[in-house]
């Protein structure tokens, strides 16, 4: 008589297989989640570092054009207000050269000689005119600041100099005596500062001249310390006298919007120092 053999697994074998499958699946799941968190944290860190680098390039490019004169005032100093987390300064927006003979209320600069990201703007920009050895200006070799009342582009410069940009300014006998080729700088009062919006800290910028609302440049930053400024004199010592500032140390400290591989957000800090225009380098 033949005996039928049944193939299969015992209950114990099935339970062992199910247990091993659960262990392997759990390990793979934890590995996947860890990899996902690590990748997300690395992406956030890269984004944060790129954000800080871009912000530092903007800040340094603005500050590099500034100048301060010991004991000077007015147009001789581009730093208007110097704070630890805020700075109001005269920003360079273009430069051109006088063509023809100005009147007491108008200056015409050659379009071909003007260099800048935009044309001069009325009721916001200021024209700094170089005055050399002028008794009427009350000093030698200064930049005389004048508010731009209006801007016109219809008139041309004399001879073959081509189109011009005519700036209407308050009447001044100094303007009428300007010679052709006199440099004219176009500036705008700007502010950089740390501010809070929607519960986060940002580095913002605004045009003080035109009364703009502050707009974010870089962020989110560390609350209270995300943007810090330290002002140094010619000897590299900290100074609170804005006329003695020769370089500015800038610190940007940012934070990721989400958590990293740990429990909290990731923070990064970028430090830089810029030497002001015309500062004597040791």
Range-by-range predicted roles:
Residues 47, 186-191, 195-282:
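Short linear sequence signals and composition-biased patches located at protein termini or domain-edge surfaces
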Residues 54-82, 86-87, 91-96, 137-145:
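Alpha-helix exit/C-cap motif
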Residues 87, 106-112, 151-173:
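A generic structural motif
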Residues 120-133:
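Short coil-to-beta transition motif at edge beta-strands of beta-rich domains
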Residues 131, 135-155, 259-282:
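Low-complexity, S/T/G/P-rich flexible repeat/linker segments used as non-globular hinges
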């Amino acid at each position: 008589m033949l005996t039928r053999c049944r193939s299969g697994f015992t209950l114990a074998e099935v339970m062992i297989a199910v247990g091993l499958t659960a262990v392997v699946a759990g390990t793979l799941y934890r590995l996947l989640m860890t990899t996902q968190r690590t990748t997300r944290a690395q992406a956030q860190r890269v984004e944060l570092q790129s954000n800080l680098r871009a912000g530092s390039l903007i800040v340094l490019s603005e500050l590099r054009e500034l100048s301060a004169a010991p004991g000077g005032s007015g147009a001789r100093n581009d730093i208007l207000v110097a704070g630890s987390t805020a700075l109001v300064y005269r920003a360079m927006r273009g430069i051109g050269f006088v063509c023809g003979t100005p009147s007491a209320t108008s200056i015409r600069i050659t379009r071909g000689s003007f260099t800048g990201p935009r044309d001069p703007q009325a009721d916001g920009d200021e024209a700094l005119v170089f005055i050399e050895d002028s008794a009427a200006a009350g000093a030698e070799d200064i930049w005389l600041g004048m508010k731009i009342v209006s801007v016109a582009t219809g008139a041309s410069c004399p001879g073959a100099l081509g189109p011009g940009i005519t700036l209407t300014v308050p009447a001044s006998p100094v303007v009428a005596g300007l010679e052709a080729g006199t440099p004219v700088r176009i500036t705008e009062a700007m502010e950089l500062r740390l501010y809070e919006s929607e519960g986060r800290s940002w580095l913002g910028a605004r045009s003080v001249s035109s009364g703009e609302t502050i707009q974010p440049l870089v962020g989110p930053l560390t609350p209270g310390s995300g943007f810090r400024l330290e002002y140094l004199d010619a000897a590299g010592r900290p100074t609170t006298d804005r006329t003695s500032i020769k370089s500015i140390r800038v610190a940007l400290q940012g934070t990721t919007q989400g958590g990293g591989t740990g429990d909290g957000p990731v923070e990064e800090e970028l430090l830089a120092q810029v030497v002001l225009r015309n500062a004597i380098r040791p």
